[in-house]
Amino acid sequence: MKIIPCPSSPLLARRVAEAAGIEIGGAVFKKFPDGELYVRVMEKEGVVVGSINSNEDLIALIFALDVLENAKAVVPYMGYARQDKVFQEGEAVSIKIVAEMLESRADEVVTVNIHSSDAASHFSKLKNLDAMPLVGEYFAGKDVVMISPDKGSMERVKTAAKHAGCEWDYMEKRRIDATTVEITPKTIDVEGRDVVIVDDIISTGGTVAEAARILYGLGAKSVSAACVHAVLAENAAIKLFNAGIKDIIATDTVECAFSRISVAELIAENI
């Protein structure tokens, strides 16, 4: 099988090919004047690599998979995974539909840190890889404390901190009275410390920006942000820097200026 890079993951696809010792296959992706996509794949079988960070990314990935007689799908960032259940009557469960689209065309689907176990449950042929150890290794030897912006991401931060060899904590909401809620790290004093806020996805950046302001208010020396998937929608990077974030560190599941960590070898070992 050859690697077929989608337009959303050209660099990562080539890194995966190099790490796995697999050739790049021939494919053409272009757009017609009316905005419709044209996809041609000059292979009968292949591993299609493409993150879903937009509707166009999804269509390009599905079209490429549909051409192949024997296909694997590598979706480093699985978009639509946050709508993993019906929250209000009448809602489409987006990830369920995406799972059906992918698994009807691919023998296996490989992704990295899908947003939740509920999202993963909609797949029957999913291999969900964990890049948090790689995030942790990036900070190995640095005197930092890792903080989860909420209790829900606690296990992710725990994993990253283990591989960084550093302390970790999570932000805890504590109700003071009927109208006041205090948000602080549960146990660690961050005064004078270099703090790294760790999460799986940074999308609009609102949660991380608010956490940064709180941490600076508690005397943190510096606050950086680290994540697997740097979606960074709606000028999120500007929002984070305005909140005092010193640096943003991410993997290349979503290719951007902050992609310092590559998941290529992790993927290559699992295809």
Swiss-Prot record:
One of its GO terms (cellular component) is cytoplasm. Its cofactor is Mg(2+). SUPFAM superfamilies: PRTase-like. InterPro entries: Pribosyltran_N, PRibTrfase_dom, PRTase-like, Rib-P_diPkinase, Rib-P_diPkinase_arc. Binds 2 Mg(2+) ions per subunit. Mg(2+) 2 binds at D150. Its main location: cytoplasm. D-ribose 5-phosphate binds at R175, D199, S203, T204, G205, G206, T207. It is found in: Cytoplasm. GO terms for biological process: 5-phosphoribose 1-diphosphate biosynthetic process; purine nucleotide biosynthetic process. The active site is at K173. It catalyses: D-ribose 5-phosphate + ATP = 5-phospho-alpha-D-ribose 1-diphosphate + AMP + H(+). It comes from the Archaea. Its EC number is 2.7.6.1. Pathway: Metabolic intermediate biosynthesis; 5-phospho-alpha-D-ribose 1-diphosphate biosynthesis; 5-phospho-alpha-D-ribose 1-diphosphate from D-ribose 5-phosphate (route I): step 1/1. Mg(2+) 1 binds at H115. Transmembrane segments: none annotated. It is an enzyme of class 2 (transferase). The keyword Cytoplasm applies. ATP binds at D34, G35, E36, R82, Q83. Belongs to the ribose-phosphate pyrophosphokinase family. Class III (archaeal) subfamily. HAMAP family: RibP_PPkinase_A. Involved in the biosynthesis of the central metabolite phospho-alpha-D-ribosyl-1-pyrophosphate (PRPP) via the transfer of pyrophosphoryl group from ATP to 1-hydroxyl of ribose-5-phosphate (Rib-5-P). This is Ribose-phosphate pyrophosphokinase 2. It comes from Archaeoglobus fulgidus (strain ATCC 49558 / DSM 4304 / JCM 9628 / NBRC 100126 / VC-16).
